[in-house]
Structure formats: C-alpha cells, structure tokens
Design a protein with these regions (language model features):
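His/Asp/Glu-rich, glycine-adjacent segments
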Residues: 67-203, 209, 278, 284, ...
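Secreted, luminal/periplasmic, and some membrane-associated catalytic domains
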Residues: 21, 57-58, 82-95, 101, ...
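Structural motif
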Residues: 18-20, 189-193, 231, 332, ...
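Anion (oxyanion) recognition and catalysis
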Residues: 43, 108-109, 224-225
Length: 404
C-alpha cells in the first residue's frame, strides 16, 4: 500500500487512468449518450453514479483535491486566485508553494510506480507536477513549443499541432495524449484533465457539445481497449447565468458593499484565471474581506441581495466546505443557480461574455459524473449509490474500490 495524506492506495497490475472532464455536468453525458457508445458500454459493464465536487466548484480546488485525495482544508488550494493578507496582494494560486501536502502522483513515483500527467490548461501543470519525477506536460505548453523530453515520443505519436486553448480540440488532444502515453510508456498511474471552453459556450445536447463528446468518447474507448482501469469525473458542472434578455446576470458585490458604507470591502473572485474568454471572471462564489468594518451589518446586507443564496462567516465556511480558514475572507458568499458575483463593473470585461454567460462556482455546479469501466466492490458501490462519493475519492475508488 502507498500512503499519502492519511489515505492508503493499492498499486494495480494494469494502468489506472483518472480523467477530469472539465465542466462536465452529468447532463452533458446524458444528452450525448447516443454519440458516446464507448462510455455507454463502459458504464454498463462497470459502474456509474454522481459525486460531489469541492466548493468552490472551480478548476484548481477540484483538480488539486483529486490529485491529493483530500479537501482544500488539507491541501491548501481553495481557488484559482486568492488574497495574500501577509503581502497584501492578489495572486493566482498556480504556484506549488501554496500546496500544503504532497500529491498522490509524487507518492506513487517515490514508491517506484511510473506516473504520467497531461493537462490541457498550463496553469495546472506546476501544481499537478509538484515533486513528480515523471511525465507531466500541458497541451497549452506543447502549442507554445514547451515539450519536455519525457513527452516527445507522445507528442510525435499524436503527430498534429496542439490546438489553441479556445479550441474544443485541445481537450481531445489531451485525452489522445493519454492513449499515446499508455502505448509508448510503461505507466502505472495517469491523470488527464481537460478544459471547459465547450461547456462555457454550449449547452448540454447542443450540436457543438455532442460533437465534442463524440470525439472524447473515441479516445476514452481506446483507453478501455488498452486494458486500463478508467475512472472519469469532473471538477464542476456548468449553468446558464443570464437575465431573461440573455445578458450576464451579475451582482457587483464590492460596488454594492462600498455604496452601502462598507468602505474597506474587498471582494475576491476565486474563479479568476488567465482564461477570461470562458467566464469573464464571473462565477457563483466570492469571498469578502471587510477590514475593520462592521461585519455583522455586512452579513445582513449581503443576505438581502437578490440572487445571493448563502452567506457564511469564515469559520462556518471553513467547516461546511472543508476550506483553509486563513485563505478565505471574513465571509464566503454563494449565488443561486442563475446568478454570478462580480467585483465592480469596471473590473470585468463583459464584452467577452455579452453573447451569454455559462459559469460555475456555487452549490448548483457540485454534481459531477463518477464513472468506472469496472465493477466496484460492494462498499464502494453502495457509497456511490448513496451519493456519498466526493470527486476527490477518484483514485481511492479506482485503485482500491475497483474489483479485479
């Protein structure tokens, strides 16, 4: 057994491939079932259910929870972006210095198991690859010519240029890279994580979404045919966040607080990342710093804002969502299914989402698929059926829960 972060994992005799299909609400796969014969067959012979994502339902916290097997309260990664109160600066949470524990991947490499990690988004590469002496690269990096020596054979075998970050094919390339990884290297454990451009732009069942999932299905089928244990989940779901006229539905929280007299209010939007075309930095989760202001009055004020669903103070949020208390504000605010939280109108470039906004971050994007191409042991299948699985249990299920 390989023990990391208080959880023990078996290494398996066949490759184990964990896949995060970024932004894939279960409804995408249901709507695309007719064009996903491989996934349908895998789930029929294996196991299928729905798991919970970490809140905030954003990319970094969920990918790192899956990579470490533990929630943000332990691994430290509670957003794509956070406010460092020590330095007084707002920073992207992409640097491994923010990680507070090792990954499953580095622990497996230390135990002598060869590991491969492929991410579409380069922003995840350093976090996922921390302490990993193995294959770890991003498709975004390949496009920019940054191909590590360990990945050259894989990239050559794919034999086509890496797509742009705003091209649906970048995620297809990522999953195909997993196939070529298994074909060219002796891999014990792999993790493939895509990007959610398609889900931000197209609804479940749309021709564009179904065409995308049909492409993904082809390479998922290849992984299955190679004899791997395949485990599929997502980092979060996705919902429309629009007014009746189709414009983005936003409450500019910092503006509202300052105008109401909470002069020192600073709103941090942990969805913030380099990919503003996806979401305009608008999601359904925010954390609020109030300085020395009247925190009691602020809570009552925010709870009355239309579209705000839940306001928790620091200790409540840390306990309920298993978050690191020192990396969130005085309050955590979650919006309802169709509302996003902004800072100030001038802080966002709304032109990138004027044709419509689909986003995530709140409680309504917490349901994610949990699919395995093998049967699960009864204790695991009953946990999944009861809705008690977290997406960060992915490798526990794949390594320990899958029947031989």
């Amino acid at each position: 057994l390989i023990t990391v972060n208080g959880r023990s994992y078996r290494s398996r005799t066949v490759p184990v491939v964990g896949i995060c299909l970024d932004g894939t609400d279960p409804s995408y796969l249901q709507a695309a079932a007719g064009v996903m014969p491989n996934l349908t067959a895998m789930a029929a012979k294996g196991s299928r259910g729905v798991a919970r994502s970490v809140i905030p339902s954003f990319t970094n916290p969920n990918n790192i929870a899956m990579a470490t097997g533990v929630p943000p309260s332990i691994n430290g990664i509670c957003g794509n972006y956070y406010y460092d109160q020590v330095t007084g600066t707002e920073v992207m949470m992409n640097d491994p210095k923010y990680l507070r524990c090792p990954t499953i991947f580095s622990a497996f490499v230390e135990a002598g198991v060869p590991v491969g990690v492929v991410t579409a988004k380069d922003k995840l590469r350093l976090l996922l690859g921390h302490g990993l002496n193995g294959i770890c690269f991003s498709v975004e990096g390949v496009r920019k010519g940054a191909v590590p020596d360990s990945a050259r054979r894989i990239v050559e075998k794919i034999g086509r240029p890496a797509p742009d970050i705003y091209d649906p094919e970048i995620s297809v390339y990522c999953i195909e890279a997993g196939v070529r990884l298994l074909e060219t290297e002796k891999i014990g454990l792999a993790y493939l994580t895509t990007t959610d451009f398609v889900q931000h732009k197209y609804k479940p069942g749309s021709p564009e979404a179904n065409a995308f999932y049909a492409r993904i299905d082809h390479f998922v089928g290849c992984l299955d045919q190679l004899g791997a244990i395949v485990a599929i989940t997502a980092d979060h779901g996705m919902n429309d966040k629009v007014n009746p006229d189709g414009s983005p539905k936003v409450q500019f929280l910092e503006t509202l607080l300052v105008d109401a007299g909470f002069r020192e209010a600073r709103v941090i939007l942990p969805i913030t990342d380099p990919y503003v075309v996806h979401h305009g930095a608008l999601g359904s989760y925010a954390t609020v710093y109030l300085g020395d202001g009247n925190t009691g009055g602020a809570r009552g004020f925010m709870e009355k804002i239309p579209g705000v669903e839940l306001v928790l103070d620091r200790s409540e949020a840390a306990e309920r969502f298993q978050l690191p208390a020192d990396r969130i504000g005085n309050f955590v605010v979650l919006a309802d299914r169709s509302t996003t939280l902004g800072r100030t109108p001038s802080w966002h470039d709304l032109s990138v989402v004027e044709s419509g906004l689909r986003s995530h971050g709140g409680l309504h994007e917490q349901s994610v698929p949990f699919i395995f191409n093998r049967q699960l042991h009864p204790t695991y299948s009953s946990k999944l059926a009861a809705g008690e699985a977290n997406n960060f249990d992915l490798f526990d299920f794949a390594l320990n829960g899958v029947q031989d």
